């Protein structure tokens, strides 16, 4: 005779950690060349002046400067863009 009743198995007992996406540097902040500005899936935010885009759509600063975000419309659709204003 078994002294313990057989326990049921759980099918939902796992979870994956978050991927830490999002905006890393906000408007008005000073950045150095190479700093990551945004980690994203696809082009939610497009690269503007002095901003580069990596293979995984990560936006990064190409020069030292100050971050500015901008929204603009094209064919009745709203887009966001990030620029770096260079500092001397």
Swiss-Prot record:
GO terms for biological process: translation. The gene is rpmA. This is Large ribosomal subunit protein bL27. It comes from the Bacteria. GO terms for molecular function: structural constituent of ribosome. InterPro entries: Ribosomal_bL27. Pfam families: Ribosomal_L27. Belongs to the bacterial ribosomal protein bL27 family. The keyword Nucleus does not apply. It comes from Lawsonia intracellularis. The keyword Transmembrane does not apply. Residues 1-25 are annotated as: Disordered. Keywords: Ribonucleoprotein, Ribosomal protein. One of its GO terms (cellular component) is cytosolic large ribosomal subunit.
């Amino acid at each position: 005779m078994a002294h313990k009743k057989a326990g049921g198995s759980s099918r939902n007992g796992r979870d994956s950690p978050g991927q830490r996406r999002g905006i890393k540097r906000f408007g008005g902040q000073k950045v150095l060349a190479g700093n990551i500005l945004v980690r994203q899936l696809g082009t939610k935010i497009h690269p503007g002046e002095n901003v580069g885009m990596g293979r995984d759509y990560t936006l990064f600063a190409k020069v030292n400067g100050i971050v500015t975000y901008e929204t603009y419309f094209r064919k009745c659709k709203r887009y966001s863009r990030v620029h770096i204003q260079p500092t001397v």
